[in-house]
Amino acid sequence: MSLPKPNSFRAGPDERGHFGTFGGRFVAETLMPLILDLEKAYAAAKADPSFQKEMNGYLKDYVGRPSPLYFAERLTEHLGGAKIYLKREELNHTGSHKVNNVLGQIMVARRMGKKRIIAETGAGQHGVATATLCARFGLECIVYMGAVDVARQEPNVIRMEMLGAKVVPVQSGTRTLKDAMNDALRDWVTNVATTFYCIGTVAGPHPYPAMVRDFQSVIGHETREQMMAAEGRLPDSLVACIGGGSNAMGLFHPFLDEPAVEIFGVEAAGHGLTNLHAASLAGGRPGVLHGNRTYLLMNEDGQIQDAHSISAGLDYPGIGPEHAWLHETGRVTYLSATDEEALAAFQLLSRLEGIIPALESAHAIAKLSQLAPKRPRDHLMVVNLSGRGDKDVPQVGDILRGRKS
């Protein structure tokens, strides 16, 4: 009797944090002891049944999980073809998938005795989730946010401050997510002993990409159970937007070893792939940023290029290393949607289903017009609705009013 083949798509990373040639731990010597401590603390937490039991309790009673899997009937009729389900992460407490990961990291931070929590944020959803959990557990919270994002995501800035967080506008570089992460890393190096850095996506040095993925995988595990209950079988395809890629990895990972399930990630094409965009797989090449090797937007000299997206949460010049590996292996197909396509999808879902999506999630919705009509009516397609669009209503309103005037 032959042994089963190893689980090739879900076994990573290796002990040094690599997914193929991607990932790793590229950090200052000052941080290495803390990174190793974090790796040990996370491994101990995973092995402790009481940790998972406590986390499951908070996911149920505080976050509001499981999030529904909703059949989008009118959207399905409008597009024709595939039967579209929405995994409704926007109904979580704080309004997005971000809280799944933050809860897990804050629980690890408490096990490590850390009282000061720092975070970076783009759209503000990770910042709001971090501020929320810090308020719940009585921890100091500092959130770094690019000054451009502070201006375009004002509702979330106000929420963070109401929750007791200190929001630090970052004025360097392009004043967006990349620069917020740079300043958060500088803070961490300076305050290693007291501070826990709560990274919001599947990027950064090992063990962050794997840890964030694990905490977000509740999305995919629930989707499997819910689809079996609703349809008696697994979905035929999955679709999710990608900045760093945590909502996508959370949905994708539990399905990676199901070869019959097609998987699509949608990057932000901005003004188009030849101009300002944030599609690092479509328009970038491998390099090192923020502690890991992945695909990055770089110029000929290897300098990081400016990213652009209408969505603050996708406005990042890189992608999580596991996504880079899945791209190179061909297991996941990566597409891209422009600002205009996302804006149209934002309005379409609002009018057809009465659900206002985050601009990030609207990038995934935008690709349905390309994917759904080509598939038969019994094809089951799940789209991760990663966040709600309340935060984007002022920005979208300004854009639409400007076009009417």
From Swiss-Prot:
Gene3D superfamilies linked to this entry: 3.40.50.1100
Top-rank taxon: Bacteria
Pfam families: PALP (PF00291)
Requisite cofactors: pyridoxal 5'-phosphate
MF GO annotations: tryptophan synthase activity
Record keyword Isomerase present: no
Functional pathway: Amino-acid biosynthesis; L-tryptophan biosynthesis; L-tryptophan from chorismate: step 5/5
InterPro entries in the cross-refs: Trp_synth_b_CS, Trp_synth_beta, Trp_synth_beta/beta-like, TrpB-like_PALP, TrpB-like_PALP_sf
Keywords (A to Z) from UniProt: Amino-acid biosynthesis, Aromatic amino acid biosynthesis, Lyase, Pyridoxal phosphate, Tryptophan biosynthesis
Annotated catalysed reactions: (1S,2R)-1-C-(indol-3-yl)glycerol 3-phosphate + L-serine = D-glyceraldehyde 3-phosphate + L-tryptophan + H2O
CDD domains xref list: Trp-synth_B
Claim: Secreted is one of the keywords in the record: no
Family: Belongs to the TrpB family.
HAMAP family, per the entry: Trp_synth_beta
UniProt subunit comment: Tetramer of two alpha and two beta chains.
This protein's name: Tryptophan synthase beta chain
